[in-house]
UniProtKB/Swiss-Prot annotation:
Its main location: other. This is Pneumococcal vaccine antigen A. GO terms for biological process: carbohydrate catabolic process. InterPro entries: CwlT-like_lysozyme (IPR047194), Lysozyme-like_dom_sf (IPR023346). It comes from Streptococcus pneumoniae serotype 4 (strain ATCC BAA-334 / TIGR4). It is found in: Cell surface. GO terms for cellular component: cell surface. It comes from the Bacteria.
Amino acid sequence: MFKRIRRVLVLAVFLFAGYKAYRVHQDVKQVMTYQPMVREILSEQDTPANEELVLAMIYTETKGKEGDVMQSSESASGSTNTINDNASSIRQGIQTLTGNLYLAQKKGVDIWTAVQAYNFGPAYIDFIAQNGKENTLALAKQYSRETVAPLLGNRTGKTYSYIHPISIFHGAELYVNGGNYYYSRQVRLNLYIIKCFTLFSTSG
C-alpha cells in the first residue's frame, strides 16, 4: 500500500514538474516574439543595455502578455497603464534602463543595482553607492522597507505573502507598497531560463 502511494506521489510530482516546464516554455516562446522589436529599438539608441537583459525583464514584468510589456508607463507619465502598445513600452523601458545603467556606471555600482532600480527608481543607485556599491538582497529589502514603502504610505512595515522560487528561501513576503526587492534576482533567473529554453529549442 505504501509503495503504491509513493508511486502516485512521485507520478504527481513528475506531472506537475512537466506541466510547469511546459508553461515556462510557452512563456519563453511568447517573450521571444518580441526579440526582433527589442533588437530594432536597441539599434536606435545609444545604450549599454543588451537584448538578453531586456527580454529577461519583459519575462519578469509581464511574460509578454500585456500591452505595456515592460510596465514602463509610470516612468514615462508618473501613472500606471498609460502605455498600451508594445513598441512604446519597450522603447520607454529601454530608455529608463539605459539611464539607470549610465548612472550606475557613473556611481561605480554593479549592473544589478541598475536593474533593481528599474523597480525601485533611480534613487536606489545612490543608496547602493553609499552602502558598499553592490546590490544585495539585504540592502534591497532595507530600501524597500525604509524608503519605498513609507514613501507610498506604508509606515508600519506591513507585509504580504509573496510566493516565488526565490522568495520561499527568504521569508516569502514583500512590503506593502514597497516594490519588489527580489526583482533583480528574478531578472537574473529569467535570463538563465530564457537562455536554457532557447538553447534547447535550437538544439532540438
